[in-house]
Amino acid sequence: MLRFILLLLFLPFFATAQTTRIDSIFKNAGEVYFSFEVNSKEELNSISKIISLDHGSILPKVFAYANKRTFMHFLALNIPYTLEASPGSKFTDLNMLLSLEAKQLNNWDFYPSYDVYVEMMYAFEDQYPDLCKVTSIGNTVDGRELLVAKLTDSLTVAQNEPKVLYTSSMHGDEISGFVLSLRLIDFLLKNYESDPEIRSILNNVELWINPLANPDGTYRNNNNSIFNASRYNANWIDLNRNYPDPEDGPHPDGNPYQPETIAFMNFTDSVGFDLSSNFHSGAVVANYPWDTWSNITADVDWWLQVMTQYASLAQQNSFNDYFSQFENGITNGNEWYEVAGGRQDYMNYFEHCREFTLELSDDKTPIGANLPFYWEANKASLLAYIQQSVFGLRGVVTDSLTGEPLSAKVFIENYDIDNSEVYSHLPIGNYHRYLSSGVYSLTFSADEYVSKTFNNVSVLNNETTYLDVQLVKHNLTTRELTTQLKIYPQPAGDFVFVAGIPEQANNVHLIDATGARVRSFKLKDSSIVLTKRNMSSGQYHFVYYVNGVQYSKSFIFE
């Protein structure tokens, strides 16, 4: 009894001491880098739901990041840990470029200050106005710009071309891809007139490049230095755990969607990308879906082919041990370690875009003198991946009578799973389906149109199969659903669940009280999560079509 009383007396002291230690740890930064040991991958995956695992970890020793809230959750597990120096503070000879006029852009052995980065991006547009358009897709927590460069020979007129996205450094301390992306823009623009391969790329592909997805993390201290850059954004949130997740749903990290996350979701929604890659560092590997679960993607054979091509070219253009940490230089994401809320899975599942995660360097922030190596090693691979966008199955879907382009679902029978189907994009009606060699049966469907199936469609690796499709329009009737569809909770707050969608349903739409279409959704499965993002309170109608019949059900967002 006396021991129990003494324990009660000392508990407040221990709690106060731990709080004081935590406050001390987070005194100068909102994130901490630390290590600990685990005995199994299952235990590691469980812990990954709490903190951000560092992808360079090799069991049993694990490295990780946490903010103050998630670190306290980790401490509750009573796992011994060691505080480590942050990767962003490893090197000091980073060679910062503080003036664009101070150096010729030849060796690219420097990191630009934030102001020089912005100046460089807009200088590309000024120097090549017919090939490059720079756009700010939004602002960070601290007000810095999220810049993307659109590269194509047709900047203002939509064409029947695949749309490809390269984006780097959503983790602010992983910046080998930052300068690599800038150099890729420069290389493509400078060589367009003289190099037939480059000219073919920009004449046949709409390429978008975002060199820096988390400038607040990269320039954490000030705009003139990347030393001690942080993984997280200015709210100390891991942006690569902040996206809707196929398995864990909206807000898998328990945080609001960050300004950077919202900007990228809106951007990718508006463009409709077909192919993408997300650049990181801290390891060297090409990481393909899925990250969140162990499900094998429908396109695993295609992924293995394309990822092996990327890694093999990188090995050929570097010294022997580059891209050799994993077998053939590639890995399945979940087989490596589990990630919920990642950008890669969001793009594949919700945007129907083929995206992989590219880990470029063991050092998250390499010294400036080493940056040219990563360019020479990856240049051919980056170009080859862009060129993959014109291969596979592609075509245009139109109305059989008017020739009007359609937004249609392209579904491969006995093949597509986990949202692997793709959709044709307006205003052209073009679709791009990447497949390994084989023979396929495809069904094309669109709202208000009769579905059409094509059997025995042959596709070959690194070649293009063209299939244009005309769909016949239905005569429509409308029915109000009363019991088939369930929408809850009602009234809804930040999100609402819709369940009971028939398997045969085509695209679904959200209509406001005025009858205007405010959002279109690509059918995932029998249920869907609608978020209130950027919508006002009021009545809405959930609408979809089955065999030409329109069904709708009303609900309210508070």
What are these regions (language model features)?
Residues D447-K473, I556-E558:
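Structured interaction patches on ligand/partner-binding surfaces of diverse proteins
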Residues A17, R479-Y488, A492-E558:
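C-terminal outer-membrane/trafficking sorting elements
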Residues P366, L371-G392, E463-T464, Q470-K473:
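Beta-strand-rich domain onsets/edges
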Residues S437-E448:
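A short, solvent-exposed beta-strand micro-motif common in secreted/extracellular proteins
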